[in-house]
Amino acid sequence: MTVEATNPVLFIDGPNPFYSQTDEDHFFAWLESIPAVKKVTGRGRGLELIVERPIDKESLRDLIALMTRYDVNRRPLKPLCDEQEDEYFRDGVRYWHSAVYG
């Protein structure tokens, strides 16, 4: 569940459970609306995302928000956060920081 500095492939866990078909539809609609997410493929219980690298900060913020909302493990986002220059992604008091950095 990691991604190398230039690797466009990101593996994440899928949300579990979805509470309705509409819930699932909204998750994938939001995920696919994020500009840096170029492709989404199911892999077992997880998802393989092809992401534009380096990822723009708004797309990364949206990924963090989506994964937080659906309680998806955020650790795979660490390399994406590490390559950001914006101090927002280094601020240890952000609501998502401990979920990404442990």
Label each residue range with its predicted role.
Residues T6-D13:
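Short, hydrophobic beta-strand segments
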Residues D13-T22:
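Short, surface-exposed ligand-recognition loops at beta-strand->loop->(often short) alpha-helix junctions
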Residues Q21-D25, L60-R61:
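Conserved strand-to-helix beginnings and helix N-cap segments that scaffold or border functional pockets
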Residues D23-S33:
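Short amphipathic alpha-helical segments
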Residues L31-T41:
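Short acidic amphipathic segments
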Residues K39-D62:
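Short, intrinsically disordered low-complexity segments
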Residues P54-G102:
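Helix-rich interaction surfaces within compact, conserved domain-sized segments
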